[in-house]
């Protein structure tokens, strides 16, 4: 009897995880709606979640006391409900966010590890713990980086929006990164005017092997 019950539970877990995998794919097709009001730019919820997670990971380097694993997991799931209710921008949020909490609760009920998801989501929303504040800061820094890219492409509203987002930052590390983002061109990581490669592209400069 125990073996039969175990097999049934295992089969149920596999079905739930399979459905979860497919559901997570919808975030790549769910647009971030704040850019509609900005008037330029496109971004999916999945793109946002990925960069938030990477920023949160980097912020842990500046805040060694933080639980890195908790931070990364929290960052990955902080907008998980948006696949069901869509992204809610600041105008939408004036009229409530209850649907998103319900969506996360329903997702949690549908998978064997749902308690972890719901607990992390609730902690992130409360923004009391160090880890939750780091994730929220990462969320804002991702938005700042997105806005800076739009500013450099010519959107005259983006700068003011970014300046407002900077004011929401809580942790010292995030505030320092925010200042750096505001004065660094989005292409600076790859485009170096002092690098002769961008002028003559001489293979000799790169020591390529034949």
Model-derived features: where do they sit?
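Alpha-helical, largely C-terminal catalytic domains
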Residues: 1-210
């Amino acid at each position: 009897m125990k073996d039969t019950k175990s097999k049934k539970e295992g089969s149920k877990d596999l079905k739930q995880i399979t459905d979860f995998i497919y559901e997570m794919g919808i975030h790549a097709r769910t647009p971030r709606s704040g850019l509609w009001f900005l008037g330029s730019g496109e971004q999916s919820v999945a793109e946002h979640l990925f960069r938030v997670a990477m920023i949160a990971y980097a912020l842990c380097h500046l805040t060694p006391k933080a639980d890195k694993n908790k931070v990364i997991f929290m960052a990955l799931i902080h907008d998980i409900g948006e696949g069901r209710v869509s992204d809610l921008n600041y105008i939408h949020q004036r009229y409530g966010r209850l649907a998103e909490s319900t969506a996360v609760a329903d997702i949690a009920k549908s998978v064997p590890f749902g308690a972890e998801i719901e607990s992390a989501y609730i902690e992130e929303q409360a923004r009391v713990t160090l880890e939750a504040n780091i994730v929220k800061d990462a969320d804002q820094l991702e938005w700042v980086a997105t806005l800076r890219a739009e500013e450099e492409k010519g959107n005259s509203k983006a700068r003011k929006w970014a300046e407002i987002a900077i004011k929401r930052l809580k942790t010292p590390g995030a505030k320092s990164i925010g200042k750096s983002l505001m004065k660094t061109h989005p292409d600076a990581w790859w485009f170096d005017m002092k690098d002769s490669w961008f002028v003559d592209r001489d293979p000799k400069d790169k020591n390529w092997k034949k």
